[in-house]
Amino acid sequence: MYKRQILYSDTLHYDTESKVATILGPSVIVSDSGTIHTSRGWYDTVNNTSLLLDQSQVESGEKILIGDSIFYNRDTGMGEVYGNMSLIDTAQHVTLQGEYGYYNEQTGYAFATDSARFLEYSQGDTLFLHADTLQMVTVDSVYREIKAYYGVRFYRIDMQGVCDSMQFNTRDSVLYMYTEPVLWNEQYQLYGDTIAIYMNDSTIEYAHVIQFAFAAQHVDSSYYNQL
C-alpha cells in the first residue's frame, strides 16, 4: 500500500502475491483523496481499484457516493454504481439517485438512469425531479448544471411541471423546459414550445414562453382566464 493509504478492517484476507485485499467485515480505507466505508468486496492495493458491495460509501470532499455495487478507481476518481445509487453533495444540499450511474471526482460529472431522481433541498421546500436519464456537472464549488432527458417530471410546493427534456444552470438561475412543456404555478398553467423559468434564490421570478404560448388561470370552479 502507499504511505498515505491505510485500510482498517474487522476481517480481511490479503494475498501477498497479487496485493489484493478481500474484505469480509466492516472496513475503512483512508487516503489523501477520501475515505471508503465498506463491509464486503475487494481492494487492489497496486492498481487502486476496488469492488465494493452492500451499500458501500465512497467519500471525497463534500461528495458521498453510495450503491449496492461500486466499481471504484481511486487514481482516476471514477465510481460506477449498480443498484440503489445515491450521490450526495453535502455542501450544495442536492442528491442524485438511480439504479445505475457513475461519478467522476476529477471532472465533477455525474450520470444516473433507470428510475433517475434529483433532489434539491437547499431551501425550505424540496424540489423532486424525475426523468429517464439525469446528468449533473459540478462547474465549481458554487455552480452546477443539471440536464434531464425523456419523461421529465418535477414537483415543488410552489411549482410543478412536465416536459420531454430540461436543463438548469445555477450560474444564471434559468430552467429551460423543452418539447411540449407544461408548467403549473398555483392557479396558473403555462404551455408552449419552450418555457424558460427565471429563478431568484430558488423561487420563480418570471417565466418566458417561447412560441405557441398558451396560459390559463383558474378563477373558480366554473371560470378560467385564457391567453
Please report, for each region that a protein language model flagged, where it lies by residue:
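Structural signature for solvent-exposed beta-strand/loop edge elements and short helix-capping sites
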Residues: 3-227
